[in-house]
Amino acid sequence: MKNFLIHLISFILIISCSKDKGENDEVVADDRMANSAITNIYASGKVSEQTAAEAKQTIFGKWDVSGSSSKNMSSSKSLSECTFNFIEFTDKSYIMSLSITGPDGPESGSIFGNYALIEADGLVTQVRLYFSVSGDDVHIATLTNIEVVEKASGGFDATFDINFEIDLGDIDIVCADLGGSYSADKEPAMEETLSAGVDSNHYKMVRNWQMTSYADSDGLVLSDVLLDYCLRNQYDPVMGEYTEVLDPDCIVPSTFQVNLSTFGTYVTMTLDESGSPLEIQTGTWTWANDEQTQFYVDDDWTGNITELSTTNWQFYEVHDTTDFRADYNFDAVA
């Protein structure tokens, strides 16, 4: 069961990247997106000179910050050393991936939530990042001076300033202050993006989903999967073996969500009853065939789609070496 949950957690995001073009009529279309219903991936410019609709397209994408260092980064010895891996914006959400080097060795951390474009006189002055705590959105960081430039050689560069409004330790990210000025390269979108019309599986798949049912050949159902999050191995000296016990200090998740982006990112979240995340994981996904009926997760997990629309997603996994099969059912989250 533990191995299953690891695969499930490491497979399944909340990053929603598709929008009907009709919602962005005021933005000039890019001819390169003529056959796609996905948000424009070619937008550029100074966000401070753009409307909210324009700025949303400009920041849309996965921005690799791993080669950039903040000019103002703190060097506190009492906190872990942290660096940005990437920050990705979708139409409504963002995911920030961090590398953390602490006393117990390297690990990764992720911050996910909604963002807001703040305007003055019709132009965007800042982008605010929020994180859900006990069901409330907390303003954790502010981005300003955002500029995206399309390079003559292809691709896009971005520069921006970020200021953290809270101590990251308040959301269990034990890092020194990451505020400062950064530069970033935009990661390429998945090839299927440019041909993702509204009837394509790619367009239907790229959104935020919540698991509504699960069943496998071992007899487990969704409630077992959620409970498994709080199970721990404990040694029984009488029996001389390890058994699974429920951690009394653990909050059993209420729901499980996944978000798939058109830049090949997935975000998985286990959520408490208030809708706030207990755990966030990120990774990559790709299509396994041209028909877009199979997909890979982290190059080692295959899902087989049986039903897919903009509101419902059903798929199954099978293990070639065993008789194990698991069926998943998700509904889209607005």
Features from the language model and the residues they span:
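C-terminal motif of bacterial Sec signal peptides marking the signal peptidase cleavage site
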Residues: I15-S16
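Short, conserved catalytic or interaction motifs in soluble domains
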Residues: K19
